[in-house]
C-alpha cells in the first residue's frame, strides 16, 4: 500500500553517485524539496508551516542563479526522519501563499543546489510556461523575452 511518505519517481539528474546510492540517500533523508512556491513566499512563512511537523534544522531558499532572488522552491531539513515524514504526510498539497505546494524527498542539500537550473537563471518549469502566473513572475521567462516591447525607440 502506498503512503504519502513513499518515494516519488522523480530523481535528481545531477546527483553524484549511483542510482542505488541515490535511493538509499532518499530513504534515509531528513531533507525535503518544496516546490510551486510563490516568488514572494518568505522563509518565515515556510518555517511557520513546516515547524508544525517538527523542529526545522534549516531552510534553504531556491534562488535565481543570476538575480539571486527567490524562484519558487526551497529545501527544508529536519533533525529526524520522523519529523520529515510528518511534513510529507501533512504539508504536501496544502496551500501556502494561495498556492498548492509540492513536497518531495531530497537526498540532502549540497551547496550550489539552491540555484535555479533554467537557462535564464530560474527554474526550468518557469521558462516555457505560457500561462500568466502572478505568483511566479508573470508569463514564462522565455515567452516574456519574446513579447517584451522594444525599448530602443528605433
Swiss-Prot record:
Location within or outside the cell: Nucleus
One GO location term (cellular component): presynaptic cytosol
Residue ranges of every copy of the RRM domain listed in the record: 30-108
Gene3D superfamilies recorded: 3.30.70.330
Region (Disordered): 1-23
Pfam families assigned: RRM_1
GO molecular function: RNA cap binding
Broad class of the protein's primary localization: nucleus
Alphabetized UniProt keyword annotations: mRNA processing, mRNA splicing, Nucleus, RNA-binding, RNA-mediated gene silencing
Biased composition (Basic and acidic residues): 9-23
InterPro entries in alphabetical order: NCBP2, NCBP2_RRM, Nucleotide-bd_a/b_plait_sf, RBD_domain_sf, RRM_dom
Coiled-coil regions, chain positions: none
GO biological process: mRNA cis splicing, via spliceosome; negative regulation of viral genome replication; primary miRNA processing; regulatory ncRNA-mediated post-transcriptional gene silencing; siRNA processing
Binding, mRNA: 10, 33, 102-106, 113-117, 123-124
Family: Belongs to the RRM NCBP2 family.
Main function: Component of the cap-binding complex (CBC), which binds co-transcriptionally to the 5' cap of pre-mRNAs and is involved in various processes such as pre-mRNA splicing and RNA-mediated gene silencing (RNAi). The CBC complex is involved in miRNA-mediated RNA interference via its interaction with Ars2 and is required for primary microRNAs (miRNAs) processing. Also involved in innate immunity via the short interfering RNAs (siRNAs) processing machinery by restricting the viral RNA production.
Subunit structure: Component of the nuclear cap-binding complex (CBC), a heterodimer composed of Cbp80 and Cbp20 that interacts with m7GpppG-capped RNA. Interacts with Ars2.
Protein name: Nuclear cap-binding protein subunit 2
Upper taxonomic lineage: Eukaryota, Metazoa, Ecdysozoa, Arthropoda, Hexapoda
Gene (UniProt): Cbp20
Amino acid at each position: 500500500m502506498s503512503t504519502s511518505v513513499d518515494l516519488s519517481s522523480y530523481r535528481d539528474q545531477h546527483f553524484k553517485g549511483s542510482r542505488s546510492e541515490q535511493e538509499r540517500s532518499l530513504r534515509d533523508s531528513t531533507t525535503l524539496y518544496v516546490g510551486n512556491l510563490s516568488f514572494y513566499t518568505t522563509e518565515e512563512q515556510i518555517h511557520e508551516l513546516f515547524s508544525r511537523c517538527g523542529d526545522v534544522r534549516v531552510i534553504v531558499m531556491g534562488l535565481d542563479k543570476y538575480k539571486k532572488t527567490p524562484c519558487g522552491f526551497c529545501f527544508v531539513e529536519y533533525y529526524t526522519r520522523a519529523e520529515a515524514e510528518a511534513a510529507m504526510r501533512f504539508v504536501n498539497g496544502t496551500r501556502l501563499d494561495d498556492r498548492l505546494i509540492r513536497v518531495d524527498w531530497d537526498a540532502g542539500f549540497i551547496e550550489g543546489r539552491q540555484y535555479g537550473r533554467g537557462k535564464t537563471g530560474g527554474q526550468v518549469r518557469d521558462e516555457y510556461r505560457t500561462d500568466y502566473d502572478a505568483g511566479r513572475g508573470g508569463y514564462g521567462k522565455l515567452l516574456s523575452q519574446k513579447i517584451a516591447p522594444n525599448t530602443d525607440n528605433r
